[in-house]
A protein has these predicted regions:
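Bacterial N-terminal signal peptides that target proteins for export
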Residues: 1-8
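Bacterial N-terminal signal peptides
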Residues: 9-23
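Mature extracytoplasmic or organellar-lumen-exposed domains after removal of signal/transit peptides
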Residues: 22, 27-250
């Protein structure tokens, strides 16, 4: 069965479930304190749908993979599609394709999408390792550091470089974290970096490296606090500064 057939099956499944979906679906609330626009929220859902569909295709064609990965990522794609349709029903958007295209060339919108997806990477990575605290909450960095404080003091190097010796308890979440890191790299390199102000070149170069570091950390199963360090101390602050992202006023 080729890719087009797989996508056809998924789209059919989407249409059936979306038609019967409950209008009271709860939306994900992004834990970071950026003020998220409606367009950024829509684009984030679209990128999540695309990422989960990519995983369905990847594990469907892999001869040594189990059907469980295909099923789980298909379920995720359906859930995100339902959330997208629920959100569209509550908005005045007439053409989602136009919103998506425009968003890719709006630096503020796209920077918010990247920030959202980075939060989703943390959530999935935390779930993959059965971590009970919220990785997207910056204050939990203190808790994470204390949990491994003795190890870090004896090793003499940054927690960011330390490999996680634990085995993932949810491989599907780990797979999602991996593919989302690819999405973030692609969006930043192909679209967002070129939209930055000229005087922010040094910051953009550092941001590019930090996004690469995040991908490396995920692929090499670095401890969760290492990912938190990259995101909360580097990626999010640089996104905010370079693209003038606004914080939520509480």
């Amino acid at each position: 069965m080729n890719r087009d057939i797989v996508l056809g099956i998924l789209l059919t499944l989407f249409s059936i479930i979306t038609y019967n979906s409950c209008p009271y679906t709860n939306y994900e609330v992004y834990a970071h304190n950026f003020s998220v626009t409606d367009d950024a929220a829509l684009l984030t859902l679209i990128e999540q749908i695309k990422a989960e569909t990519e995983l369905v295709n990847t594990y469907f064609v892999a001869s040594n993979s189990s059907n469980s990965s295909v099923i789980e990522h298909a379920k995720n794609a359906v859930n995100f599609t339902n959330s997208l349709n629920d959100k569209l029903r509550q908005s005045t958007v007439a053409d989602i394709t136009q919103v998506y295209t425009n968003g890719l060339y709006n630096s503020t919108t796209l920077a918010l999408v990247v920030a959202n997806l980075v939060d989703e990477i943390l959530r999935n990575y935390g779930s993959a390792y059965g971590i009970t605290y919220d990785l997207t909450n910056m204050s939990n960095m203190v808790m994470a550091t204390m949990l491994h404080g003795n190890d870090n003091s004896s090793s003499g190097h940054s927690i960011m470089l330390e490999k996680n010796n634990a085995v993932p308890v949810n491989m599907y979440n780990y797979q999602t974290a991996q593919v989302l890191s690819n999405v973030v790299n692609r969006l930043f390199n192909d679209k967002l970096s070129g939209q930055a102000p000229v005087n922010e070149k040094v910051k953009i170069d550092n941001l590019e490296q930090s996004i690469k570091d995040l991908k490396y950390a995920i692929n090499n199963k670095v401890r969760a606090e290492g990912l938190m360090e990259i995101v909360h101390m580097k990626i999010h602050p640089m996104l905010q500064s370079a693209y003038d992202l606004k914080l939520v006023v509480r």
